[in-house]
């Protein structure tokens, strides 16, 4: 399960905590989940899908968005920069970038270098900002000093 700090960092970047946010591509609510993805996640959770609740019920949006992000985190063996990138650009893009640039989880490339090579400026910036915000929330919520060793693995 993603940490509270990670979820807050995603929400901050996705919607700036605006529960009624709507993107130009149709993503909705706090976690800016796409309706098609939300429908699939609701089915997996055995809960009712409601497009209107994506923007009117923050807990519903967070429940679906968290489940989806957790599935990405599992797909990438807890390597959250991959899951963050996949949440923004889609899972297939991450797989192609790992194939093209190497896998930082296998020490084929440094994580920072891999992030810098992300082809889409929006996704590269997104991953960088979410990672920055994780550290802000770790300190804000827990007064926990930031540790670099093992940081990129949940």
Region locations from a protein language model:
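Catalytic glycan-binding domains that act on GlcNAc-containing polysaccharides
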Residues: 1-154
């Amino acid at each position: 399960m993603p940490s509270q700090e990670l979820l807050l960092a995603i929400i901050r970047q996705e919607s700036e905590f605006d529960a009624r946010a709507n993107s130009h591509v149709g993503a909705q609510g706090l976690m800016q989940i796409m309706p098609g993805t939300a429908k699939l996640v609701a089915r997996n959770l055995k809960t009712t899908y409601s497009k209107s609740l994506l923007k009117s019920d923050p807990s519903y949006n967070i429940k679906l968005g968290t489940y989806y992000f957790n599935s990405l985190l599992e797909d990438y063996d807890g390597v959250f920069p991959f899951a963050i990138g996949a949440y923004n650009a889609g899972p297939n893009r991450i797989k192609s970038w790992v194939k093209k640039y190497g896998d930082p989880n296998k020490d084929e490339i440094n994580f920072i270098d891999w992030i810098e090579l992300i082809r889409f400026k929006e996704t590269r910036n997104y991953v960088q900002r979410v990672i920055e915000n994780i550290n802000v929330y770790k300190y804000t919520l827990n007064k926990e000093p930031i540790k670099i060793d093992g940081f990129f693995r949940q």
